[in-house]
Regions:
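Extracellular carbohydrate recognition and processing domains
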Residues: 86-115
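Short amphipathic alpha-helices and their capping/turn residues within compact interaction modules
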Residues: 29, 51-55, 64, 77-79, ...
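Hydrophobic side chains in beta-strands
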Residues: 11, 61, 76, 130, ...
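Hydrophobic/aromatic beta-strand segments within beta-rich folds
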Residues: 45-48, 55-62, 110-146
Length: 167
């Protein structure tokens, strides 16, 4: 049975003051989530550090109905060998791939899209690079949000079963 794995947001290239990246560190019904700054320059980046090196197997991305990223690149990072204090800024990242999201015009911005990416990589860090937002009449500030990040692992093997990021 999967269980939640601890993580913290360790890097953010920008944030809306009302929706700081630190909101992702606690997953509660009252969490507001992170959002890119208004009229920001893309790409935007968010970095997550796990409590320990883990075998990441799946990423799920759930888009917001109107504030939609066009493309999100996924990277898994490892600490530099011999580094006594691993840091996101010094990590070696390997590109796992990307997801493209539908602009959602056909549903009149009523639906949310769920994407699942399967991969197998050991890492201490996860980097998500948001390339730009879909321009539409409801996204007046050209933003992309992340509502929550839930990371699960197998309790005994300490492998990720999935990471869910709601964008």
């Amino acid at each position: 049975m999967p269980s939640k794995l601890r993580f913290k947001v360790c890097y953010c290239s920008g944030e809306d003051p009302d929706f700081p990246a630190s909101e992702l560190n606690a997953h509660t019904p009252h969490t507001r989530g992170w959002q890119t700054p208004r009229f920001c320059e893309y790409p935007q980046e968010i970095g997550i550090q796990f409590a320990s090196v883990s075998d990441i197997q799946q990423l799920q991305v759930l888009s917001h109905q109107s504030k939609i990223a066009t493309r999100i690149e996924i990277f898994v990072g490892t600490a530099v060998e011999g580094d006594p204090r691993p840091a996101y800024s010094r990590a070696k990242f390997k590109r796992m791939g990307y997801v493209s999201l539908d602009p959602n015009e056909r549903s009149n911005f009523q639906a949310r899209e769920l994407k699942t990416v399967q991969f197998n990589a050991n890492g201490l860090f996860l980097k998500l690079v948001i390339h730009k937002c879909s321009v539409n009449r409801l996204n007046i500030y050209s933003q992309v949000p992340t509502s929550s990040s839930v990371i699960h692992s197998q309790l005994l093997s300490l492998h990720f079963s999935y990471l869910c990021v709601m964008i």
